[in-house]
Curated annotation (Swiss-Prot):
One matching Pfam family: CTP_transf_like
Similarity section: Belongs to the NadD family.
Keyword terms: ATP-binding, NAD, Nucleotide-binding, Nucleotidyltransferase, Pyridine nucleotide biosynthesis, Transferase
E.C. numbers: 2.7.7.18
Top-level taxon in the UniProt lineage: Bacteria
Keyword Transferase: yes
Role, per record: Catalyzes the reversible adenylation of nicotinate mononucleotide (NaMN) to nicotinic acid adenine dinucleotide (NaAD).
GO biological process: NAD biosynthetic process
InterPro entries: Cyt_trans-like (IPR004821), NadD/NMNAT (IPR005248), Rossmann-like_a/b/a_fold (IPR014729)
GO molecular function, one term: ATP binding
Organism: Dechloromonas aromatica (strain RCB)
Protein name: Probable nicotinate-nucleotide adenylyltransferase
Reaction(s) catalysed (UniProt annotation): nicotinate beta-D-ribonucleotide + ATP + H(+) = deamido-NAD(+) + diphosphate
Length: 217
């Protein structure tokens, strides 16, 4: 069986170093062969992004340009329908076959809300789920909704090598370097014409400035 493939979805509005570190560290912690970035087109769980889906896609393309282990999947941006994770996973499973191990990368906050996602239980039949958390702050079962806590207990794998042994169905957790960076923070800085340098790649910041993105209208 080939190495597990990480799947990293999000609005990336804009992509920043926190996103890049999560993707980079997941490869080392989880033994992934690479990470496929999947920018959302019309995210159903968030408000409408401030910039177009194509612009967010291009910013991710710029951010990951020099990392051979990163790849870009534009399918959700190109689709006209809202971006539901389970639909994307079904497409990838058809594309990559039943034996490829797929690992959905999510942060602890997003995982806590997993039970609100469309057909969330079906996700485990299609992929593993890897939950990143702050060092010293592991995922607490008591903080999860009952249904999700039950799934977490039943599916949790202590050894990440299990990700390669099966194509889907497990939950693993891993600590990642905590960077106090958020897309909301960056948008506020840019809207107020303050510097966002060193919070995101220079190539992305140059693109934002060239196209006058995130400015107050």
């Amino acid at each position: 069986m080939s190495e597990p493939l990480g799947l990293f979805g999000g609005t990336f509005d804009p992509v920043h170093f926190g996103h890049l570190r999560l993707a980079e560290e997941s490869i080392a912690h989880l033994g992934l062969g690479g990470v496929r970035w999947i920018p959302a087109g019309q995210p159903p769980h968030r408000g409408v992004p401030q910039v177009t889906a194509q612009q967010r896609l291009e910013m991710v393309r710029l951010a990951m340009a020099n990392n051979a282990r990163f790849s870009l999947d534009p399918s959700e941006v190109e689709a006209e329908a809202p971006s539901y994770t389970v639909h994307t996973l079904e497409r990838l499973r058809r594309e990559l076959g039943p034996l490829q191990s797929l690992v959905l990368l999510v942060g602890a906050d997003a995982f806590a809300g997993l039970a609100t996602w469309h057909r969330w239980r079906d996700i485990f039949a299609l992929a593993h789920v890897a939950v990143s958390h702050r060092p010293g702050f592991p995922v607490e079962i008591s903080s999860l909704p009952h249904e999700l806590a039950s799934e977490f207990t039943d599916r949790r794998r202590a050894d990440v090598r299990g990700l390669k042994a099966s194509p889907a169905g497990g939950i693993v957790t891993f600590a990642m370097t905590q960077l106090a960076i958020s897309a909301t923070q960056i948008r506020k800085l840019l809207a107020n014409e303050l510097s966002a340098r060193y919070l995101l790649p220079d190539s992305v910041l140059d693109y934002i400035q060239t196209h006058s993105l995130y400015r107050n209208s």
